[in-house]
């Protein structure tokens, strides 16, 4: 509309996330090819979230498919303030700056507390990662826990398990977009290769984690490869939890246990990473 009719519109297309790239992938590619602008909202997203409808409707890979379209910018936010920041930035980029891009944003229908936005996190939300919680513990054993979407709630819950039962301090990071972090990492790698005489550029995720102590663990409601694409850019030990395999029909709690992405498996994985480093 903005090109053919000089009438900019702000389309929002809301659907079950499995019915997006899984069902209309050619149209999503055509949207990129034709330089469409707007927002795709993948609702009830994640393999353990649309929990009663089995493998047909449980989406564990839409963000992986979104990553194949160069001008599709994808996010997996957890909190309302993250969603607001992302949409505000998208409106500015598409309709004020005139950038030819469209957005894929996954959302849930799960009831949980939405905290106030921490001060100064807007840039991190847009670029793909920010620190949600920093442990006040002085414990020498420390881990970095990362997550997105609905599974970030399990990541937050794992903090108490590690602290109370094992004396391990845990910082929490919200990873709003692994895809955008990877694109940034690849862009830095290419720039460094093509400009050996200039100061090295650090990927954003490398920069924010370079002073963080201990191994990193990331859990999402998507296949492990979604998180694993960040491995080259994360300093130190990096462990990934995800929902590989077909979906199943059961409660969300049982599905998160089955796919090993709940708070207990996050804690176990963190302890295993500390063990591998000789910290415990």
Where are these regions (language model features)?
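Hydrophobic anchor at the start of a short beta-strand
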Residues: 11, 38-39, 170, 238
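A short, small-residue-rich loop immediately preceding and capping a beta-strand
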Residues: 6-19, 39-42, 147
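Alpha-helix C-terminal capping segments
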Residues: 1-8, 30-35, 67-69, 230-233
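Extended, hydrophobic alpha-helical segments in both membrane/secreted and soluble proteins
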Residues: 10-15, 23-27, 31, 62, ...
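A glycine-rich helix N-cap at a beta->alpha junction
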Residues: 30-47
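Buried hydrophobic packing segments
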Residues: 1-3, 24-31, 87-90, 270
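Thiamine diphosphate
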Residues: 48-61, 67, 74, 82-86, ...
């Amino acid at each position: 509309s903005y090109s053919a009719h000089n009438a900019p519109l702000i389309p929002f297309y809301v659907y079950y996330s499995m019915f997006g790239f899984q069902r209309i992938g050619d149209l999503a590619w055509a949207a990129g090819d034709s330089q469409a602008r707007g927002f795709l909202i993948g609702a009830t997203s994640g393999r353990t979230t649309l929990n009663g409808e089995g493998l047909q409707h449980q989406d564990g890979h839409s963000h992986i498919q979104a990553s194949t379209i160069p001008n599709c910018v994808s996010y997996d936010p957890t909190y309302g303030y993250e969603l607001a920041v992302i949409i505000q930035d998208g409106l500015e980029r598409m309709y004020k700056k005139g950038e030819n891009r469209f957005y894929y944003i996954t959302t849930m229908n799960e009831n949980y507390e939405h905290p106030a936005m921490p001060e100064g996190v807007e840039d991190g939300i847009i670029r793909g990662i920010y620190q949600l919680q920093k442990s006040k513990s002085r414990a020498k054993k420390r881990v970095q826990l990362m997550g997105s979407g609905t599974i970030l709630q399990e990541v937050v819950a794992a903090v108490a398990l590690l602290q109370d039962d094992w004396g391990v301090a845990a910082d929490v990071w919200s990873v709003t977009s692994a895809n955008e972090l990877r694109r940034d990492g690849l862009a830095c790698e290419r720039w460094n290769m093509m400009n050996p005489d200039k100061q090295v550029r650090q990927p954003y995720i490398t920069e924010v984690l370079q002073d963080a102590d201990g191994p990193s663990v990331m859990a999402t409601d998507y296949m492990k490869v979604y998180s694993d694409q960040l491995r080259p850019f994360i300093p130190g030990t990096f462990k990934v939890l995800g929902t590989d395999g077909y979906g199943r029909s059961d409660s969300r709690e049982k599905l998160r246990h089955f796919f090993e992405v709940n708070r207990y498996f996050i804690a176990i994985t963190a302890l295993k990473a500390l063990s591998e480093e000789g910290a415990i």
